[in-house]
């Protein structure tokens, strides 16, 4: 009898599904953080498969900074409605009404108030004790050293020097009241794995990932798409049309595009075979201070 072997992608899928089911079994009130990006889309599909044909026993939550690409918000609402997800959308409306934004306050203040503080408020509001995130270890060095079950204290802070041992597939889910765990079920996936799985499973994604002629400006070395009329007047005469796509998605003034002709999944996979830079190199927030991502994660960022 021929020995049955899982493919590389199916092994990753099995590991992720095991992690998702473990969280559902161990925690009282988990939530899946949904950024609308490719990694979130894969994570959502894994959750759907983990509990099929039943309903996923936890909600999706999107922290809306009010500066996401219009296509992202449209995709979010259509996907949640079509697939019957319980979608929670939270924003820091106080900061938004005060005019906080990336152009007026800079990436650091904007990210802290509109993303980190909004997230922490939402976690406290709904009393979630576990939150799934779509981070991967190959993205960035601070994420590379974080556990799959990442402990957070009662202030939602992460201490990279005080992480719990994590042996094989044994995860420590013990928390006291007020503490929580951030869970990263696709930690061991690479960007190429993500794209190959999207192709394998035919997972719908935001069209911004595909190359297309788009109105962009060059802002401090980043190709920024002019997504709405909040682009400051001083930049508007710099707008030009370029064939670009996005490798990662976030707030449009803080997310750089890459020049590319990859307009299909197959072309994106082929492009990923030869790329040598992480997709996080196009995210402005990762470079707004020394050790930027680790500091943000210590403060409670995704």
UniProtKB/Swiss-Prot annotation:
Coiled coil: none annotated. It is an enzyme of class 2 (transferase). InterPro entries: PAPS_reduct_dom (IPR002500), Rossmann-like_a/b/a_fold (IPR014729), SO4_adenylTrfase_ssu (IPR011784), Sulfate_adenylyltrnsfr_sub2 (IPR050128). Keywords: ATP-binding, Nucleotide-binding, Nucleotidyltransferase, Transferase. Gene3D superfamilies: HUPs. The keyword ATP-binding applies. It comes from the Bacteria. Its EC number is 2.7.7.4. It catalyses: sulfate + ATP + H(+) = adenosine 5'-phosphosulfate + diphosphate. The keyword Nucleus does not apply. GO terms for biological process: hydrogen sulfide biosynthetic process; sulfate assimilation. GO terms for molecular function: ATP binding; sulfate adenylyltransferase (ATP) activity. Pathway: Sulfur metabolism; hydrogen sulfide biosynthesis; sulfite from sulfate: step 1/3. Signal peptide: none annotated. With CysN forms the ATP sulfurylase (ATPS) that catalyzes the adenylation of sulfate producing adenosine 5'-phosphosulfate (APS) and diphosphate, the first enzymatic step in sulfur assimilation pathway. APS synthesis involves the formation of a high-energy phosphoric-sulfuric acid anhydride bond driven by GTP hydrolysis by CysN coupled to ATP hydrolysis by CysD. Belongs to the PAPS reductase family. CysD subfamily. NCBIfam families: CysD, PRK05253.1, PRK12563.1. Heterodimer composed of CysD, the smaller subunit, and CysN. This is Sulfate adenylyltransferase subunit 2. The gene is cysD.
């Amino acid at each position: 009898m021929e020995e049955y072997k899982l493919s590389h992608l199916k092994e990753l899928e099995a590991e992720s599904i095991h992690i998702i089911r473990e969280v559902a079994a161990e925690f009282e009130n988990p939530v899946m953080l949904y950024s609308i990006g490719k990694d979130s889309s894969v994570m959502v599909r894994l959750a759907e498969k983990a509990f099929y044909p039943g309903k996923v026993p936890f909600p999706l939550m999107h922290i809306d900074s009010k500066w996401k690409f219009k296509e992202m918000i449209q995709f979010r609402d259509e996907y949640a409605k079509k697939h019957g997800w319980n979608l929670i959308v939270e924003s820091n409306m106080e900061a938004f009404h005060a005019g906080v934004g990336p152009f007026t306050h800079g990436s650091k203040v904007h990210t802290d108030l509109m993303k980190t503080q909004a997230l922490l408020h939402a976690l406290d509001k709904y009393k979630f004790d576990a939150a799934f995130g779509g981070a991967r270890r190959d993205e960035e060095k601070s994420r590379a050293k974080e556990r799959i079950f990442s402990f957070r204290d009662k202030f939602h802070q992460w201490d990279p020097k005080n992480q719990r041992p994590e042996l094989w597939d044994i995860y420590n889910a013990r928390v006291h009241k007020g503490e929580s765990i951030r869970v990263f079920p696709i930690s061991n996936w690479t960007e190429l794995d993500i794209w190959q799985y999207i192709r394998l499973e035919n997972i719908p994604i935001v069209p911004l990932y595909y190359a297309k002629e788009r109105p962009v400006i060059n802002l401090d070395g980043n190709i920024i798409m002019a997504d709405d009329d909040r682009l400051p007047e001083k930049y508007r005469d710099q707008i030009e049309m370029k064939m670009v796509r996005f490798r990662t998605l976030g707030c449009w003034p803080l997310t750089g595009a890459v020049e590319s002709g990859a307009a299909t999944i197959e072309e994106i996979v082929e492009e990923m075979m030869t790329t040598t830079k992480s997709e996080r190199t196009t995210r402005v927030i990762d470079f707004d201070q020394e050790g930027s991502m680790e500091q943000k994660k210590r403060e409670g960022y995704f």
